[in-house]
Structure formats: C-alpha cells, structure tokens
C-alpha cells in the first residue's frame, strides 16, 4: 500500500448520518468514486482498496468508536509500514461552518477525541488531515455532534465530501501541496 485514507466516525446505523460521522460518509463516497467496497473486516475496522494513478490505496473505517480510532489505524499503519505523511485522516470539525473543507499536513488534535487517539497511537501529529465543517454547536456538544444533519445542511456536506474526494484524486495524481491548494482554495477541477 502507498496510502491509507481513513474516515472517522462511529459504527452502527443510528450514527450513519450524524455530524460526527462525516469521515465515514467521505470514505463511503470515496469507495463509490474509485469503484470499490469498504466491506472487509480487518484492523478493527472495515477496509477496501483500489489502485489509482499507479498508487495502491487502503480505505479504512475504524469500528472502534471515535475515541479509540487510533487503535484501528495503528494496526493498518504498522501492517503496511506506512509513514505518517501517507496516512490521510478525514473527520468532522466544529471549528468550521457546515460544508467548509480544509486540508493541512499536520497539527494538534484541536479537541477532537478521534484525532487525539490517533496522535497517541502514532506518537506524532505529523499526518495529513481533511477537516469537514459540521458547524458550531448550538447546544450541548455531545448531543450536537451525534445529531443528524438538518435538511438544508445535507447538500452542503455532500458538496464538501465531493470536494474532499476531488482533492484526494489530485493528491494521488500529483502531490499533497496541489491537493491542499485545491481543497483550501477556490480552484475548480
């Protein structure tokens, strides 16, 4: 494998379309985008793989629940001997309005427990991540992130996921800097 792309979320039908599962939704979209399925059980998660632009990619949805995501990811990283810069993590972020997408090469956990778990397990903050804005909580944080998107927000989230997926495509075709320029800017593919 050349890359691992993982999306963070919680397993179970009741969480499928919740704000905290933006990462899982992105992985599902990527699976369709690259014509694969994420349905094999491995690394305490569900996996699928594809090859694009000469690169082999593993898609991973940790089934450990959000706060223990690192346990699943470290197993895959160690198995494939992937360097942290070849691990791309997609997750929800309350710091951005619904539908805003941002990519960066590294950073702190920003208060996100899934990212905190990954940093603990990897022993580094130096892995790329794509953050999908889910909006600032209007009420209790836990209830908010575990609530479903409102009707007017769903289209914004799916446009954000589409933009993130196009960014992944650019990354695989070229490099992370071009992907970041696309995702963080107003560039249209």
Swiss-Prot record:
It is an enzyme of class 3 (hydrolase). One of its GO terms (molecular function) is peptidyl-tRNA hydrolase activity. Its EC number is 3.1.1.29. The record marks 10 as: Discriminates between blocked and unblocked aminoacyl-tRNA. One of its GO terms (cellular component) is cytoplasm. Signal peptide: none annotated. TRNA binds at residues 15, 65, 67, 113. SUPFAM superfamilies: Peptidyl-tRNA hydrolase-like. It holds the Pfam family Pept_tRNA_hydro. It is found in: Cytoplasm. The active site is at residue 20. InterPro entries: Pept_tRNA_hydro (IPR001328), Pept_tRNA_hydro_CS (IPR018171), Pept_tRNA_hydro_sf (IPR036416). CDD domains: PTH. NCBIfam families: pth (TIGR00447). HAMAP family: Pept_tRNA_hydro_bact (MF_00083). This is Peptidyl-tRNA hydrolase. It comes from Caldicellulosiruptor bescii (strain ATCC BAA-1888 / DSM 6725 / KCTC 15123 / Z-1320). The gene is pth.
